Amino acid sequence: MADYQRILSYLYRYEKSEKKECLGFIKAEQKSAILKLTIQINDERLLHGMELKLCFYEKQGEHWRVRKLDSIITEENKEEFHQMYSKEQLPEGFDIKKQSGVVLYYQEEYYYGS
């Protein structure tokens, strides 16, 4: 299990960079270059058909690098998302243990983040 890595983090709602309440969690597990994601969000503001842009971010020197992984189309205000990604579906050089967190954007100034 030496190649197994996991991130488990709460997801908070952000409005104009201000951290609000905790509304869910993300669990990301990577083993043998396969990434398994579990995301749960319970937010009454989450409407049917909203697009959430799923991005991971990491610190690289003085800068932050944001990598978009996927887009999620919501079905209801209690969203539960399970997905697996092969090495070919991941951004080049993606390594879960190097990631600092995750962001799910739905508008420029409104998002969920760890």
Where are the regions a protein language model picked out?
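N-terminal targeting/export leaders
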Residues: M1-S114
